A protein has these predicted regions:
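An alpha-helical, amphipathic repeat domain used for nucleic-acid recognition
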Residues: 1-152
């Protein structure tokens, strides 16, 4: 079971919660699970900080999630708060705002609304649902809205 767990952790970054779930699925007892997880951590197959960094990078770049949604997902995986904070600090602020602006611009062209107020409400709900902070979303919606006014 230990070798199986090592192979499982070698294929991609895993957190303790994922490994425990898989070991449980394989029928390991809590004592065996604890020993295997400790071994995997000692041999650096599992590293919470490394997992957190990879998770943040992937969800932010590829899934275009905001900090709030990423943080929530990491909490669901029982990652310590200090490790989450450290991982979220790796996000480049300029790139973060560019991703948010791009999402809002794409969505703005597809949203059907009678008034600008209604359109902005839909855009804000969309971006907040993606996990971006409300302040950043409102700022971005206003900025992209101003750009549209100048283009007309």
């Amino acid at each position: 079971l230990r070798y199986k767990a090592e192979a499982y952790c070698s294929s991609m970054e895993r957190c303790v919660t994922d490994v425990e779930a898989k070991l449980s699925q394989w029928g390991a007892t809590p004592e065996v699970m604890e020993k295997i997880v400790r071994h995997l951590q000692d041999e650096r197959y599992i590293d919470q900080k490394r997992f957190c960094s990879a998770f943040v990078r992937d969800k932010y770049r590829f899934n275009q999630w905001g900090r709030v949604k990423i943080s929530q997902a990491l909490r669901m995986k029982k990652i310590p708060a200090d490790v989450i904070a450290e991982g979220l600090e790796e996000i480049d602020e300029r790139e973060y705002v560019e991703i948010l602006s791009g999402l809002i611009e794409q969505k703005r062209s597809r949203v059907k609304a009678c008034t600008e107020y209604e359109r902005n409400g839909k855009l804000i709900r969309f971006a907040v649902g993606r996990g971006f902070e409300i302040e950043a979303v409102c700022r971005c919606v206003i900025q992209t809205g101003e750009d549209d006014v100048y283009l007309d």
